[in-house]
């Protein structure tokens, strides 16, 4: 696995969960002897929804909702066999989407 790099992208709606998961990944990678770049916070995507409260009249009465998608990127430089095995066995919190790519 020499001269390779693992890029890990994390997405979650809760910033505490994503920070906890990135911390676990960083600790696991460093414990196995790999060099870690990051976590790099990417821009948070904010989706806003406006819903009419009244089903018939009163168009001025509305509720607004927002959902935020937090993203982080980690690069693991020169991973070892131990690093890959440890990352595969790592159990992260539910609600965190993980994408792993080799490059």
Curated annotation (Swiss-Prot):
Q: What taxonomic lineage is listed for the species of origin?
A: Bacteria, Pseudomonadati, Pseudomonadota, Gammaproteobacteria, Pseudomonadales
- Alphabetic keyword roster: Ribonucleoprotein, Ribosomal protein
Q: Indicate yes or no for the key word Metal-binding.
A: no
Enumerate the InterPro entries for this protein: Ribosomal_uS10 (IPR001848), Ribosomal_uS10_CS (IPR018268), Ribosomal_uS10_dom (IPR027486), Ribosomal_uS10_dom_sf (IPR036838)
One biological process term from GO is: translation
Q: Which GO terms describe its cellular component?
A: ribonucleoprotein complex; ribosome
| UniProt protein name | Small ribosomal subunit protein uS10
Quaternary structure annotation from Swiss-Prot or TrEMBL: Part of the 30S ribosomal subunit.
Q: Determine if Repeat is one of this entry's keywords.
A: no
* Biological source species: Pseudomonas syringae pv. tomato (strain ATCC BAA-871 / DC3000)
For this protein, the record's Pfam families field holds:
Ribosomal_S10
Which function does this protein serve? Answer: Involved in the binding of tRNA to the ribosomes.
Q: Which family does it belong to?
A: Belongs to the universal ribosomal protein uS10 family.
* Molecular function GO terms recorded: structural constituent of ribosome; tRNA binding
